[in-house]
């Protein structure tokens, strides 16, 4: 069944037109959607021209897409080397025989660059991106701080930091910004990366707050990063969380 779908995809003109119309309709309304605008700005802040919104098909390309073009794209895609992951009780040899005889695996396939690491935007100074919107009832503020190259040996420390800073309502950010000072309805912050050699590590944060509290919320958020309060009573709980996470991931 999978082979037939790959080699002879049953593409339906009516269904495709319906999907294109749905996508075009979504694009038309997202320009006035505050959450979508905030997401697009965050993407541009982190990736610049590599943003998913900048890389997508233009409206014209979307409208003029046809089945023959889409079929050609599918046929081109299966010419590249593929990785197949199997989880189950069958022995390796059995799975290998089934897949090699059932899937359209081609000889001399094109080399793949997967997984592709998206280049992140670099900054030489503090930069603020701003979208004025009179219809926005709340301020959505994103933070992005590049932290250099990914290092596997720092994963545990980064996880501990994330629990300390953003571990639910007991996390430093939510506790200080929302619980103690009532400056936001939600807030978070964490060190993250794609987890691949050659990828970048960065701090990603967010505050959602009332418009009249935005400036004070940003000041408090940045003070937590530059002058981080110490909560030694939380360390044992964080260690316990990390141990349980390590056991569950085995």
Regions found by a protein language model. Name each.
Residues 1-113, 181, 186-250:
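Charge-rich, well-structured scaffold segments of protease-associated domains
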Residues 111-172:
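His/Glu-based metal-binding/catalytic segments typifying zinc-dependent metallopeptidases
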């Amino acid at each position: 069944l999978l082979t037939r779908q790959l080699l002879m995809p049953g593409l339906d003109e009516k269904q495709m037109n319906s999907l294109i119309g749905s996508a075009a309709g979504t694009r038309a309304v997202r320009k006035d959607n505050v959450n979508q605008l905030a997401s697009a700005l965050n993407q541009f802040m982190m990736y610049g021209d590599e943003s998913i919104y900048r890389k997508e098909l233009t409206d014209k390309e979307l409208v003029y897409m046809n089945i023959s073009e889409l079929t050609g794209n599918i046929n081109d895609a299966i010419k590249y080397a593929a990785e197949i992951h199997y989880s189950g009780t069958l022995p390796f040899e059995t799975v290998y025989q089934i897949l090699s005889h059932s899937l359209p695996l081609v000889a001399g396939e094109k080399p793949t660059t997967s997984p592709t690491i998206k280049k992140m935007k670099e900054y030489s100074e503090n930069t603020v991106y701003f979208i004025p919107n009179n219809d926005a009832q709340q301020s959505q503020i994103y933070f992005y701080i590049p932290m250099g190259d990914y290092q596997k040996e720092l994963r545990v420390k980064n996880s501990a930091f994330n629990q300390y800073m953003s571990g639910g309502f007991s996390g430093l950010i939510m506790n200080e910004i929302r619980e103690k000072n009532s400056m936001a309805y939600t807030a978070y912050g964490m060190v993250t990366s794609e987890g691949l050699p050659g990828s970048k590590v960065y701090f990603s944060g967010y505050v959602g707050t009332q418009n009249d509290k935005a400036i004070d919320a940003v000041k408090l958020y940045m003070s937590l990063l530059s002058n981080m309060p110490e909560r030694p009573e939380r360390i044992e709980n964080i260690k316990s969380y990390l141990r349980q996470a390590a056991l569950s991931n085995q």
